[in-house]
């Protein structure tokens, strides 16, 4: 069963972006992850008794899965900020400020064999995302209020230190189709995946990631279903089984804070003889996966 989102529409929508970005002809999918909501992703989520009375981990929740995949793309932060408690279950408290996020051990896919360290790395991130957005955990589905006071935008800034300059939640009802697509293309051209939500009359709500678009203007969607159905779609989603085309909204402007060193965006790492570091200071021989790396005082976003 897909995760249900209890959507409140009290979102503040701005009609312009603070930053103008040149729109590219197309953007190849930015994400390499194909994550989901069950094991190992949910190994740190709370347990509830199943139909046999045995303890079972709740599902991650699609909001947390989408947030986690976007954060993994940015490989940020190295360490969280402060402490947070789930208002719907006050026994769920996370000390973000004491958590080092182990990006190096988060795998793009967990279909094949993986280590305990790799499982813990992704499970920690996704559980922390869930607590940050006040996830209501369940065995069949985990849900949250996408426009709640402590929603995704608040969580990204408060607990994970993302730049709040252009970060906002916007509702499609405030835009024409052309304006909406322009926002999408601008963010993706800037290397900023989008967290997207919509409702279906037959399946409830879902939150997923937009991470690219093709030359025909179709948007690449990562649904958070272990790679299933990932592909290019018209934004109107008039597709049986994927018709999350009601009350669409999105979180745009998701990026780490600017630094004085600047950021260089590239599709491949420069020469192999330079020294590379991850954001948390580990030395790597050469970046072999997408993410953010530091070399000679500059940050490189490898696409």
Predicted regions and their residues:
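Serine endopeptidase catalytic core focused on the charge-relay Asp
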Residues: 134, 138, 148-150, 159-163
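Bacterial Sec-dependent N-terminal signal peptides
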Residues: 1-23, 134, 138-139, 156
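Residue-level detector of functionally pivotal "anchor" positions at catalytic/ligand-binding pockets or at interdomain
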Residues: 242-280
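Active-site-adjacent substructure of cysteine-protease-like catalytic cores
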Residues: 154, 158-222, 258
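Catalytic Cys-His active-site segments of thiol-dependent hydrolases/isopeptidases
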Residues: 216-235
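C-terminal outer-membrane/trafficking sorting elements
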Residues: 264-303
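Active-site-adjacent structural segments surrounding the nucleophilic cysteine of cysteine proteases
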Residues: 19-145, 214
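Stable alpha-helical elements in mature extracytoplasmic
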Residues: 58, 63-70, 148, 152-156, ...
């Amino acid at each position: 069963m897909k995760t249900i989102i209890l959507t409140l529409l009290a979102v503040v929508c701005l009609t312009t972006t603070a930053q103008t970005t040149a729109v590219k002809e197309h953007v190849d999918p930015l994400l390499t992850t194909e994550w989901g909501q069950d094991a190992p992703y949910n190994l740190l989520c709370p347990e509830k008794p199943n139909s046999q009375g045995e303890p079972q981990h709740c599902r991650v929740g699609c909001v947390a899965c989408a947030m986690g995949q976007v954060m993994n793309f940015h490989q940020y932060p190295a360490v969280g900020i402060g402490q947070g408690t789930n208002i719907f279950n006050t026994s769920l408290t996370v000390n973000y400020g004491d958590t080092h996020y182990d990006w190096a051990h988060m795998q793009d896919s967990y279909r094949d064999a993986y280590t305990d360290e790799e499982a813990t790395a992704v499970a920690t991130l996704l559980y922390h995302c869930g607590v940050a957005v006040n996830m209501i955990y369940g065995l069949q589905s985990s849900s949250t209020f996408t426009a709640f006071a402590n929603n995704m935008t608040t969580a990204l800034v408060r607990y994970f230190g993302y730049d709040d300059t252009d970060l906002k939640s916007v509702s499609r009802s405030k835009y024409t189709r052309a304006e909406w697509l322009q926002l999408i293309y601008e963010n993706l051209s800037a290397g900023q995946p989008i967290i997207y939500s919509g409702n279906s009359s037959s399946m409830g709500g879902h939150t997923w990631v937009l991470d690219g678009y093709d030359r025909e203007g179709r948007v690449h969607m990562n649904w958070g279903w272990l790679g299933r159905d990932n592909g290019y779609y018209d934004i109107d989603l008039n597709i049986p089984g994927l018709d999350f085309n009601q009350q669409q909204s999105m979180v745009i402007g998701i990026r780490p804070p600017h630094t004085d060193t600047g950021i260089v965006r590239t599709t491949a790492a420069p020469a192999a003889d330079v020294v590379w570091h991850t954001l948390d200071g580990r030395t790597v021989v050469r970046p072999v996966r997408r993410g953010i790396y530091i070399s000679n005082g500059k940050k490189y976003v490898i696409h």
